[in-house]
Amino acid sequence: MSDNVSEGLLAEPPFSKEAAVDPATASHDRGAGGQATTFAVVITSYNYRDFVLEAVESALAQSRKAVQVIVVDDGSTDGSDALLREHYAADERVTLISGVNGGQLSAFQRGVNAARAEVICFLDSDDRWEPAYLAHLGALYDTRADIDFVFSDLQLFDQQDRVMKFHDHAVDLGYTAISTYVLTQWYGAPSSALSMRARWARQALDLPDSFQRTWRLSADNCLVFGCSVLGAHKYYLPTGCVRYRIHGANGWWSNESPRLEYINKMTSSALIQHYAARVGMGPECIEFSKLEFMTKPRPPWKETKRYVRLVMMRRVSPWRKWERAVNILRRGWRLRG
């Protein structure tokens, strides 16, 4: 789970104004073939014997069924692997993968490699979903073929009780490559609220072996930063269906400190630079900030101000900076979501 909870390359997709999607009324048809989007769930687990069955059962209990529920046990030493095999070895709905401990990035890669669905959803083994979660996602993915990456809000439970959210309502974020590259902006959520089309998960997790040690924890950064910089079209969809457990043994939550925050910022910056190098992205991309902003149909006011900051960082005359900033402010105010 990542400690970046806050508030790709350009094209011209057919945007529509965003709205919360009702899974009860939205069609599951997509495209001329009328096929519903297929989902695979990747659950990664390490020494969470007390919680992992609850996570798996929540994935199996979805009103819209996943075609695969893949559980990757990352070398647990607390009997988790045996417990999983006791319950699911004969269950055709569940694919069990086990091996030596390699960390979260390695577990993500193993799970994604086994996925055979169009969209991959991630679930940490100490969290759980409400039964309508995949139905909410499916209603969006089915009707918006241009959307690549969707993240949700989270309801904290156990030792805390509050909601973590990006915005008050659904937001079509368009493209986020430049904002991520220049500002290290994090457009995402912890793993259990992340989903993306399979090709984006594979691209984001296609990393050198040397990254395994760095991202033993907080590998959701690889998904969030990678998909942004590589060019995914992102969407925030509050579902109210993701339960995020705070229990004192969370990988990073229980170990926050200024030192770890510093290390996370530095490693995140290096990660972003790696993805940028793959697509030939450099500092000159800031000149296209306005174009990226134009891909957002109804940007929240905070997002508008973020892009004003970007255009003011351009190496041009003050007059040209302000001219573009005013244009962004006008558009953002008119369309604000």
Predicted regions and their residues:
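Soluble, non-transmembrane catalytic domains of enzymes that act on hydrophobic metabolites at membranes
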Residues: P258-P300
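Membrane-interface aromatic/basic loop that binds lipid-linked glycans or pyrophosphate carriers
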Residues: M1-E18, E284-G337
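Short N-terminal secondary-structure initiator segments
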Residues: T44, F51, I178-R199, G282-K296, ...
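Detector for methionine-enriched segments
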Residues: M1, M164, M196, L205, ...
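Short, surface-exposed, charge-dense and proline/glycine-enriched linear segments
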Residues: W129, I178-W186, V242-A249, M266-Y275, ...
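Short, isolated positions within intrinsically disordered regulatory regions of eukaryotic proteins
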Residues: V52, E92, A132-Y133, A204, ...
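Nucleotide-sugar donor-binding/catalytic module of glycosyltransferases
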Residues: S2-L260
